[in-house]
């Protein structure tokens, strides 16, 4: 679940010293076009003991007893698994008692398909709604298997705004998440900040050209994600292509200028 949260953890780095003016082409308000976007997700469930499971839903393995109680998870969060039957699980992640995300998992009758109603609570009180369908890619019983997404449906409006910052910098503003990220073009690693940010999280980036940014995310010096943001020649479309380290395929998000 952590990897499917929509974070705009960006900074831009520039080794050449060239400056972009305040009329940077990235500046503007951007809205996700779900019909042109493609999200690919992979998750793994293994048996770790009696009624105990090792989950890897992005970011690392968490071992959880499926008894409905909150148990220690990654990055200071807690995770609970509530079993609603052989074909139904509810997974809830919290931070400091506040629910961050909820995943309602359902198995098909033949056990080959998993649907996940993924809901992420935003800082402004709204809910990000995303429905995934997965196929089983390894043998297993019930939810125990490796699962790879085959389709997704975004049910929420996703918007963010890019503003100038200190001459050649940029500020990314995500209103629903109450996130304001100030980007400095110095080519150095910078710590991520915020209440829900994993410990040891950092990012660095560079401009490949005037229409493309490349950003690398790390946790404790380990690369977790590399992504590019590329503007179309007419500057009306912004395409984010993300390559999570634990995924074989890229996630592609297409935004249109408002």
PLM segments and residue spans:
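Bacterial N-terminal signal peptides
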Residues: 8-18
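Bacterial N-terminal signal peptides that target proteins for export
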Residues: 1-9
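Hydrophobic small-molecule pocket/channel-lining residues, especially in calycin-type beta-barrels
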Residues: 22-258
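Intrinsically disordered, low-complexity peptide-like regions
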Residues: 5, 21-22
């Amino acid at each position: 679940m952590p990897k499917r949260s929509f974070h705009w953890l960006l900074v831009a780095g520039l080794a050449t010293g060239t400056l972009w003016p305040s009329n940077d082409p990235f500046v503007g308000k951007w809205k996700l076009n779900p019909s042109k976007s493609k999200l690919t997700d992979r998750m793994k469930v293994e048996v770790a003991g009696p009624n105990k499971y090792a989950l890897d839903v992005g970011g690392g393995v968490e071992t959880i007893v499926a008894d409905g109680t909150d148990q220690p998870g990654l990055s200071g969060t807690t995770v609970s698994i509530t079993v609603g039957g052989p074909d139904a699980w509810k997974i809830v992640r919290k931070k400091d008692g506040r629910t961050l995300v909820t995943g309602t998992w359902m198995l098909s009758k033949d056990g080959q398909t998993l649907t996940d109603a993924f809901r992420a609570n935003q800082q402004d009180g709204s809910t990000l709604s995303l429905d995934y369908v997965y196929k089983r890619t390894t043998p297993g019983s019930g939810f125990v298997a490796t699962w790879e997404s085959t389709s997704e449906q975004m049910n929420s409006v996703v918007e963010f705004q890019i503003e100038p910052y200190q001459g050649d910098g940029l500020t990314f503003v995500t209103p629903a998440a109450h996130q304001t990220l100030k980007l400095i073009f110095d080519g150095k690693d910078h710590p991520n900040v915020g209440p829900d940010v994993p410990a040891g999280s950092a990012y660095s980036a560079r401009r490949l050209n005037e229409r493309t940014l490349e950003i690398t995310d790390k946790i404790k010096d380990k690369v977790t994600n590399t992504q590019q943001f590329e503007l179309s020649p007419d500057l009306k479309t912004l395409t984010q292509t993300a390559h999570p380290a634990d995924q074989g395929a890229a996630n592609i998000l297409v935004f249109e200028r408002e």
